Amino acid sequence: MNVSTTPYQNARLLIDGEWVESQTTEWHDIVNPATQQVLAKVPFATPDEVNAAIAAAQRAFQTWKLTPIGARMRIMLKLQALIREHSKRIATVLSAEQGKTIADAEGDIFRGLEVVEHACSIGTLQMGEFAENVASGVDTYTLRQPIGVCAGLRRSTSRP
């Protein structure tokens, strides 16, 4: 894949398992810092699109929270396999959009894989604690359970 000669396209939003064209009027150019070539345009999602994504995530959570830990782990292992399978392509794209060497981009991918591998061990991380006889005839226990939807937001350093 030659990112430097690939024409850019507008990125779409993934909402409720479907790729959606954004209705926004604000777009962010992803620029190769070495060539100043626009690689892609990424939408600043509209409030309605953000709300639709949140609502979809909340609906999905109702199933996810009932999914056995082993099944969740298999999903994360599949993600790990897909990242490994496509790591060269991902590194090429990272290199072009961030102006870093392929080796540095591959290091980023490796660090990301470490996070995924950590998530694969969630079964042992979700074990609660049990304390016997904390008071006369009273035992206590804690449970670790998924609590809901969260979002990761990052500041764009190149937004006007």
Q: Which role fits each region the language model picked out?
A:
Residues 1-34:
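Hydrophobic face of amphipathic alpha-helices that form TPR/SEL1-like repeat modules
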Residues 13, 95, 117, 124, ...:
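Short glycine- and Lys/Arg-enriched binding-loop motifs that mark or flank ligand-binding interfaces
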Residues 17, 36, 72, 116, ...:
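Residue-level signature of catalytic and energy-coupling elements of molecular machines
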Residues 29-30, 47-50, 160:
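A short local loop/turn or secondary-structure capping micro-motif enriched for an aromatic residue
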Residues 39-126, 137:
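Glycine-rich loop-to-alpha-helix module at the N-terminal edge of alpha/beta enzyme cores
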Residues 129-160:
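Conserved small-residue-rich beta-alpha loop and adjacent elements
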